Amino acid sequence: MSLVSVHNEWDPLEEIIVGTAVGARVPRADRSVFAVEYADEYDSQDQVPAGPYPDRVLKETEEELHVLSEELTKLGVTVRRPGQRDNSALVATPDWQTDGFHDYCPRDGLLAVGQTVIESPMALRARFLESLAYKDILLEYFASGARWLSAPKPRLADEMYEPTAPAGQRLTDLEPVFDAANVLRFGTDLLYLVSDSGNELGAKWLQSALGSTYKVHPCRGLYASTHVDSTIVPLRPGLVLVNPARVNDDNMPDFLRSWQTVVCPELVDIGFTGDKPHCSVWIGMNLLVVRPDLAVVDRRQTGLIKVLEKHGVDVLPLQLTHSRTLGGGFHCATLDVRRTGSLETYRF
């Protein structure tokens, strides 16, 4: 029986991969890092700081990921952790060379849909070989009967990036490129964020890989930067949490217009370490749904917790102290690969 079987973001959770902060670092500045992550923050890529994150940040984060793993295990969830590797090692192709990033966010590079797990063609050169951290896990999933795909490795040449273009237009359409975290699963419907971490060709490739059973919905003008899981968060069938700074009547995905929306309240700014944060205060709504009536939420976001409880969602309050520093909350730092339930179409 395939150990990979997941159709949406909310069915009762059975198995998950939790990332690691060990060896996390900011990769050397190159055209990809500058265009995708820092073009609004610095005048040139030479100004972007690089190197390991502070030891304190990594130690505290690894301890908090261990707590998350323990709490999920207590709930009967099978938890997997990636192997450790040297993220400072050189990554090179005939076109470029760089060093690595981190293995903190399995959500970014792996997409599980049904009984298929896909290695996505990620936007940053530094993440070109990130799936190696999960190779042993993927081999086990493949042996269990899962379908294992790797998207075509992108060239990621300089022409792929336009740092001076407006946000949302800095990733060109020369080849399929997308981070897995640009995708949300709603049964047969998949939301695909067209942004600086996912282009139009990426959506086209994903549709061709999954076939006619699924409908990939490219969403444009929703959020210009990277990833979608701090913009729209499905809680259960018919109920979705939305970011009021990004989602409105004009850009709400058509297939979600019949869903009840919960507007995320103002979030607590949890701060960050270093020169600039890796993500905004909205990382506070980056929660992990364990089952339709339970979610893992940052304990500091008391306003959000009250709103969720009002809508029948109990909360397991935990903490990732450095989520703004490392660029990921509970959804980013995990990858759910098996949930109970079957494939359905959700229209209301």
From Swiss-Prot:
SUPFAM superfamilies: Pentein (SSF55909). Keywords: Antibiotic biosynthesis, Streptomycin biosynthesis, Transferase. Its EC number is 2.1.4.2. CDD domains: amidinotransferase_StrB1-like (cd21135). GO terms for molecular function: glycine amidinotransferase activity; scyllo-inosamine-4-phosphate amidinotransferase activity. It catalyses: 1-amino-1-deoxy-scyllo-inositol 4-phosphate + L-arginine = 1-guanidino-1-deoxy-scyllo-inositol 4-phosphate + L-ornithine. The active site is at 179, 227, 332 (amidino-cysteine intermediate). Pathway: Antibiotic biosynthesis; streptomycin biosynthesis. GO terms for biological process: creatine biosynthetic process; streptomycin biosynthetic process. Gene3D superfamilies: L-arginine/glycine Amidinotransferase, Chain A. Homodimer. Belongs to the amidinotransferase family. Catalyzes two non-consecutive transamidination reactions. It converts scyllo-inosamine 4-phosphate into N-amidino-scyllo-inosamine 4-phosphate and N1-amidinostreptamine 6-phosphate into streptidine 6-phosphate. This is Inosamine-phosphate amidinotransferase 1. It comes from Streptomyces glaucescens. The gene is strB1.
